[in-house]
Amino acid sequence: MAKLDVALAKVEGHHKEALLWFKRFRGQRVTWAEIKEHAEFGARLVNQAKGIYKPAYTDFALSVRTIQDGPYPDKEVEFRANGSWVCQYYQENIDPNQRDKEATNRGLMRCMEEQIPIGFLIKRKPKPGVEYEVLGLGFVKAWEDGYFTIEGINLNGETTDGIDAARARASQPLLSDPDDIFDAKDVNDLRQKQIATVAV
Protein backbone atom coordinates (compact mmCIF):
# COMPACT_ATOMS: atom_id res chain seq x y z
CA MET A 1 0.00 0.00 0.00
CA ALA A 2 1.48 3.31 -1.11
CA LYS A 3 1.27 6.09 1.46
CA LEU A 4 1.23 9.67 0.28
CA ASP A 5 3.25 11.16 3.14
CA VAL A 6 6.08 8.69 2.54
CA ALA A 7 6.09 9.45 -1.19
CA LEU A 8 6.08 13.22 -0.69
CA ALA A 9 9.12 12.94 1.56
CA LYS A 10 11.10 11.79 -1.49
CA VAL A 11 10.78 15.13 -3.30
CA GLU A 12 11.65 18.73 -2.43
CA GLY A 13 11.68 22.29 -3.70
CA HIS A 14 9.33 23.30 -6.52
CA HIS A 15 8.42 19.66 -7.13
CA LYS A 16 7.09 19.20 -3.61
CA GLU A 17 5.42 22.62 -3.61
CA ALA A 18 3.50 21.73 -6.78
CA LEU A 19 2.41 18.32 -5.49
CA LEU A 20 1.18 19.89 -2.26
CA TRP A 21 -0.91 22.30 -4.36
CA PHE A 22 -2.65 19.33 -6.02
CA LYS A 23 -3.26 17.82 -2.60
CA ARG A 24 -4.63 21.06 -1.17
CA PHE A 25 -7.00 21.80 -4.08
CA ARG A 26 -8.31 18.25 -4.49
CA GLY A 27 -11.97 18.25 -5.50
CA GLN A 28 -12.02 21.92 -6.49
CA ARG A 29 -12.38 23.63 -9.83
CA VAL A 30 -9.75 26.14 -10.85
CA THR A 31 -9.48 28.42 -13.85
CA TRP A 32 -6.66 28.27 -16.35
CA ALA A 33 -5.82 31.83 -15.31
CA GLU A 34 -5.35 30.67 -11.69
CA ILE A 35 -3.08 27.84 -12.82
CA LYS A 36 -0.92 30.25 -14.82
CA GLU A 37 -0.87 32.76 -11.98
CA HIS A 38 0.49 30.11 -9.62
CA ALA A 39 3.45 29.60 -11.96
CA GLU A 40 4.26 33.31 -11.76
CA PHE A 41 4.52 33.33 -7.97
CA GLY A 42 5.42 29.71 -7.19
CA ALA A 43 5.93 26.32 -8.77
CA ARG A 44 4.71 25.64 -12.29
CA LEU A 45 1.91 23.06 -12.29
CA VAL A 46 1.38 22.08 -15.95
CA ASN A 47 2.78 22.36 -19.45
CA GLN A 48 0.56 24.57 -21.59
CA ALA A 49 1.50 22.72 -24.79
CA LYS A 50 1.29 19.12 -23.56
CA GLY A 51 -0.95 16.98 -21.39
CA ILE A 52 2.01 15.58 -19.46
CA TYR A 53 4.28 17.99 -17.61
CA LYS A 54 7.85 16.91 -16.86
CA PRO A 55 9.85 19.83 -15.47
CA ALA A 56 13.41 20.28 -16.70
CA TYR A 57 14.69 20.22 -13.10
CA THR A 58 13.69 16.59 -12.45
CA ASP A 59 13.59 13.17 -14.09
CA PHE A 60 10.01 12.70 -12.84
CA ALA A 61 6.76 13.80 -14.44
CA LEU A 62 4.82 16.22 -12.23
CA SER A 63 1.29 16.26 -13.62
CA VAL A 64 -1.11 15.14 -16.33
CA ARG A 65 -4.30 16.71 -17.61
CA THR A 66 -7.09 15.54 -19.86
CA ILE A 67 -9.02 17.65 -22.33
CA GLN A 68 -12.15 17.06 -24.35
CA ASP A 69 -11.47 16.02 -27.95
CA GLY A 70 -7.73 15.74 -27.31
CA PRO A 71 -5.37 14.03 -29.79
CA TYR A 72 -4.95 10.91 -27.64
CA PRO A 73 -7.47 8.17 -26.71
CA ASP A 74 -7.51 8.77 -22.95
CA LYS A 75 -10.24 6.81 -21.17
CA GLU A 76 -12.80 8.17 -18.73
CA VAL A 77 -11.81 8.47 -15.09
CA GLU A 78 -13.61 5.93 -12.89
CA PHE A 79 -14.48 7.26 -9.45
CA ARG A 80 -14.84 5.00 -6.41
CA ALA A 81 -16.96 5.38 -3.29
CA ASN A 82 -13.86 5.50 -1.03
CA GLY A 83 -12.65 8.69 -2.69
CA SER A 84 -10.09 7.04 -4.95
CA TRP A 85 -10.20 6.91 -8.74
CA VAL A 86 -8.42 5.23 -11.64
CA CYS A 87 -7.68 6.36 -15.18
CA GLN A 88 -6.09 4.84 -18.28
CA TYR A 89 -4.06 7.78 -19.57
CA TYR A 90 -2.48 7.52 -23.01
CA GLN A 91 1.21 8.28 -23.43
CA GLU A 92 2.63 11.08 -25.55
CA ASN A 93 3.26 9.69 -29.07
CA ILE A 94 0.50 7.59 -30.61
CA ASP A 95 2.89 4.66 -31.25
CA PRO A 96 3.38 2.55 -28.08
CA ASN A 97 6.74 1.36 -29.42
CA GLN A 98 7.99 4.95 -29.33
CA ARG A 99 7.18 5.44 -25.64
CA ASP A 100 10.72 6.08 -24.44
CA LYS A 101 11.40 8.56 -27.23
CA GLU A 102 9.44 11.17 -25.27
CA ALA A 103 10.84 12.70 -22.07
CA THR A 104 7.30 13.02 -20.70
CA ASN A 105 6.71 9.27 -20.94
CA ARG A 106 10.09 8.53 -19.42
CA GLY A 107 9.13 10.84 -16.57
CA LEU A 108 5.94 8.88 -15.90
CA MET A 109 7.89 5.62 -16.01
CA ARG A 110 10.29 7.02 -13.40
CA CYS A 111 7.31 7.96 -11.23
CA MET A 112 6.07 4.38 -11.51
CA GLU A 113 9.49 2.94 -10.64
CA GLU A 114 10.04 5.18 -7.61
CA GLN A 115 6.36 5.58 -6.61
CA ILE A 116 6.39 9.36 -6.84
CA PRO A 117 2.86 10.81 -7.08
CA ILE A 118 1.64 13.06 -9.87
CA GLY A 119 -1.07 15.70 -10.02
CA PHE A 120 -4.16 15.09 -12.15
CA LEU A 121 -6.47 17.63 -13.80
CA ILE A 122 -9.59 17.17 -15.93
CA LYS A 123 -10.76 19.94 -18.22
CA ARG A 124 -14.40 20.68 -17.36
CA LYS A 125 -15.10 23.94 -19.18
CA PRO A 126 -13.85 25.02 -22.62
CA LYS A 127 -12.95 28.51 -23.80
CA PRO A 128 -13.72 31.17 -22.83
CA GLY A 129 -12.96 30.86 -19.14
CA VAL A 130 -11.35 27.40 -19.21
CA GLU A 131 -11.77 25.47 -15.96
CA TYR A 132 -10.14 22.29 -14.65
CA GLU A 133 -11.23 19.94 -11.91
CA VAL A 134 -8.37 19.02 -9.58
CA LEU A 135 -8.53 15.28 -8.88
CA GLY A 136 -5.56 15.59 -6.57
CA LEU A 137 -2.67 13.15 -6.51
CA GLY A 138 -2.30 9.68 -7.96
CA PHE A 139 0.34 7.02 -8.53
CA VAL A 140 1.37 5.50 -11.86
CA LYS A 141 0.76 1.78 -11.34
CA ALA A 142 1.31 0.22 -14.75
CA TRP A 143 1.92 0.77 -18.46
CA GLU A 144 0.49 -1.42 -21.22
CA ASP A 145 -0.10 -0.85 -24.94
CA GLY A 146 0.42 2.88 -24.63
CA TYR A 147 -1.75 3.37 -21.54
CA PHE A 148 -0.51 4.43 -18.12
CA THR A 149 -2.74 3.23 -15.29
CA ILE A 150 -2.98 6.04 -12.74
CA GLU A 151 -4.54 5.26 -9.36
CA GLY A 152 -5.81 8.17 -7.29
CA ILE A 153 -5.37 8.17 -3.54
CA ASN A 154 -8.35 7.52 -1.28
CA LEU A 155 -9.57 9.78 1.51
CA ASN A 156 -6.94 8.29 3.85
CA GLY A 157 -4.10 9.33 1.55
CA GLU A 158 -3.40 5.77 0.43
CA THR A 159 -3.65 3.64 -2.67
CA THR A 160 -3.43 -0.12 -3.04
CA ASP A 161 -1.18 -2.46 -4.99
CA GLY A 162 -1.49 -5.78 -6.78
CA ILE A 163 -4.10 -8.16 -5.38
CA ASP A 164 -5.27 -5.54 -2.92
CA ALA A 165 -5.97 -3.15 -5.79
CA ALA A 166 -7.99 -5.78 -7.63
CA ARG A 167 -9.93 -6.54 -4.46
CA ALA A 168 -10.57 -2.85 -3.89
CA ARG A 169 -11.85 -2.43 -7.44
CA ALA A 170 -14.17 -5.40 -6.99
CA SER A 171 -15.51 -4.17 -3.68
CA GLN A 172 -15.98 -0.51 -4.56
CA PRO A 173 -18.86 0.47 -6.86
CA LEU A 174 -17.67 2.73 -9.64
CA LEU A 175 -19.41 6.10 -9.82
CA SER A 176 -19.76 7.93 -13.11
CA ASP A 177 -19.38 11.20 -11.23
CA PRO A 178 -17.84 11.98 -7.83
CA ASP A 179 -21.03 13.83 -6.85
CA ASP A 180 -23.29 10.81 -7.48
CA ILE A 181 -25.46 9.95 -4.49
CA PHE A 182 -26.82 6.50 -3.67
CA ASP A 183 -30.52 6.24 -4.55
CA ALA A 184 -32.37 3.39 -2.82
CA LYS A 185 -35.16 3.65 -5.40
CA ASP A 186 -32.74 3.16 -8.28
CA VAL A 187 -32.41 -0.50 -9.32
CA ASN A 188 -28.86 0.00 -10.60
CA ASP A 189 -27.75 1.64 -7.35
CA LEU A 190 -29.26 -1.21 -5.33
CA ARG A 191 -27.53 -3.78 -7.55
CA GLN A 192 -24.16 -2.04 -7.11
CA LYS A 193 -24.65 -1.93 -3.35
CA GLN A 194 -25.49 -5.65 -3.25
CA ILE A 195 -22.44 -6.53 -5.35
CA ALA A 196 -20.17 -4.41 -3.12
CA THR A 197 -21.61 -6.02 0.03
CA VAL A 198 -21.04 -9.54 -1.30
CA ALA A 199 -17.48 -8.70 -2.45
CA VAL A 200 -16.52 -7.41 0.99
Where are these regions (language model features)?
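Short, solvent-exposed secondary-structure boundary/capping segments
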Residues: 146-153
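Intrinsic structural disorder
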Residues: 1-2, 11, 64-67, 121, ...
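Acidic, glycine-rich low-complexity segments with interspersed aromatic residues
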Residues: 28-125
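Short, charged surface segments at domain edges that flank catalytic/cofactor-binding sites
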Residues: 155-200
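Short beta-strand-centered aromatic/proline hotspots
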Residues: 130-143
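Long C-terminal interaction/binding lobes of large macromolecular proteins
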Residues: 2-18, 22
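Short, well-ordered, mixed-charge alpha-helical segments that flank or form enzyme active sites
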Residues: 127-131, 159
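Ordered hydrophobic segments in well-structured contexts
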Residues: 63, 117-119, 134-137, 149
